[in-house]
Amino acid sequence: MCYIRPTESGVFKIEDCTWNTKTPFASIRRIVQDRKEIFRIRPGLWALEEYRSLLADRGIVAQDVTNSDSVQVQEFNHSYYQGLLLYIGNMKKLETYVPAQDKNRRCINVKLGEISTLTEVPPFSYQEFVNRSSTIDVMWFQPNSLGNEVMMPDSFFEVEHSTDIQNSLCKFSDLQSFNAQMFIVADARRHDEFIAKLNHDYFKPISDRVKFVSYDKLDRYYEGLMTQQKSSLVL
């Protein structure tokens, strides 16, 4: 199986081959866009055309106007971008958490529970707050030398492909007392909807704290971190 996707272990591992360019991801992106035998699954994620049907049987499908609202696409997007957020948090040396009900979902071929570093939400406050946060799609926590018991949340992320953004904003509102960043991750086409919901009077206390991150922007950020980590990319 061939996925064209930068990971922490590299891209296309081939012995005795070095990628001698300062912009490997831009070069890869240009190459795959010009090759008919390669198709785009998501921003930054490509595969060989000959595996399209096999990948679809495994729930990995290319999104287009005909299937963007299908259950298969929704489930894939949700777990895929949860996975990216976990990988990013790990690269930033933060502790990462994904809800218990999502641990067996996969980001391509890796279970989310195998990417996250925490198996339980750290007891950072009263149990009611801990319980409320436990269903947030991805959380990052600041490591603490004193142990998990005093670990505080760094960032909250909710991935919203087609579900109601307002539900996520309600979670953030309930957790506004904590000095954590708050993000809605979604298709760029939902930005106007995000602004409209956030402008509701109920969410005024958090209106300056919640940020919108598009799928494309998240992918570019991931690639940027990978570029910083590797002065040269081994293929």
Predicted regions and their residues:
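Catalytic cores of nucleic-acid endonucleases
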Residues: S125-I136, N148-S214
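Active-site metal-binding core of divalent-cation-utilizing nuclease and nuclease-like domains
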Residues: V73-Q74, N90, V98-M151, E223-V234
